Amino acid sequence: MSNTMFFNLLLNIGLLVLIATMLTKLPMVRSMLLEDSHAMGSRAALAVIFGLVSIFSTYTGVRAQGAIVNTRVIGVLAAGLLGGPYVGIGAAVIGGLHRYLFDIGGFTAVSCAVSTFVEGLIGSAFSKRFKAGKIDGAGVFLITALAEIGQMAIILLISRPFPAALDLVCLIAFPMIIMNALGMVVFLGTFNRVFMEEDSQFAEKMRLAMGIVDQSLPHLRKGLYSKTDMEATA
């Protein structure tokens, strides 16, 4: 069963990375990720997008002892890290509510819905540090692992009967913690390329601007007294 879970999680992570790659190619998504205005419309759109990613992860999960082994944490945690509190909480509400409605009365329906919301809060809490470049891949791995450990704790606190919850956590904890933490690093790396490309374009524009300044300075020092100097500066 453990090997099946590892394989399923790996497959789901691959699908999420594919989705992330396609999303980063859409001009609308790129502009929303890069914009500084933080318009509510953009925040809502990003929350829906990452909420749908979370829902997708629920559907592609594999059932195990009344629970669903999944990669849902990747969507909601990434929403918080990339988009901030509004996006993270919005995506978590969408993903968590769907998880509850997906299996109403199920053994882990409430606990998994609650943990999804908590994971969105965790991502939101680290958003400023992540955007400032203060959280590297190892930090992302650790945050995701801690979020998943939190999910296991919530399952133990809420799901009943307790012996069944304990058996479930013993079965799914290691695969979900390790694979989702690794998957989050790869998933965010896909989106980080958007910021890297933007920085590269900015650096190229600055290089061109400095080149123009270097070419113009000799003529500016002499003064624009001749037609030749004015044409050279232009």
Question: What annotation goes with each model-predicted range?
Answer:
Residues 83-84, 97-102:
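Interfacial segments of multi-pass membrane proteins
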Residues 228-234:
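Short, intrinsically disordered, charge-balanced linker/junction segments flanking boundaries
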Residues 1-25, 47, 58-73, 103-216:
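Membrane-embedded alpha-helical hairpins and interfacial helices in multi-pass inner-membrane proteins
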Residues 65, 76, 80, 88-92, ...:
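Alpha-helical transmembrane segments and their helix-entry boundary regions
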